[in-house]
């Protein structure tokens, strides 16, 4: 056999031998689509692990470029991910992101607005009890990093070669096959969340929070700090969306953690300022902070920060109805003092 002929056959054989496994991995990654780069659905990708919503939800938006025509936007931290968009009468684009920092809100909101076919009629915006805390810093890279990565040429294709994508695809295949939702966030292809994750030891976690507060007090009697730019940040957000109605709401906090926080001497005045700033900017705030049968029942929470989705259904109901309920107080300038009194502060 001539050397050139032998070399050509060896090359072709190598390509075939190596190409079949690579092709199989690419096909599998595409079929399961753990990065949400595509729009197809099947029985083996109907549950998706929410490992990083900044990547996944941004990809979900770009996979539907030119097709987005949502009425409203939901923005907030991981707590909002358990408020499913199907609970709303209008079509809601859910851009809830784990550990979303107040300095990141506007970037993600403007990105969603740019991709949507029309201005949002309503923006449901969560501001948590820690959103004003100066010492809480952003936990992720800047938003533009995720936008650039999602829009990078050939990103959808090159990601199919990734072993990391394959590992995530394999996990999603398994939980979809078994209808397994014992993870923190199992998404379907419409960004609906399901979870049966086991509850942590809440009693132990509350005691740990008490110890942490005590340690901070001993280390620095004036450790709590309010972000002096907080109100201006809110004003900038409001002014960036002049055509949208804002429904601003607090996190629904488990009663024990709420009490520890707002009754702490260093937090009480900061909490009042936080509520006051929101009302000054938006006219009202939908507060889910309170002591009631929902917030005092630990069975409604799987940790001291997050409720189960059936409680999120209640939050969605109240955000739309716009009247006080057992779990909601709509705070305005007129009833603010009475609201603080109801919380014992």
Model-derived features: where do they sit?
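Hydrophobic membrane-insertion alpha-helices, especially the h-region
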Residues: 9-30
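Membrane-embedded segments
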Residues: 69-157
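C-terminal regions of proteins
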Residues: 265, 272-344
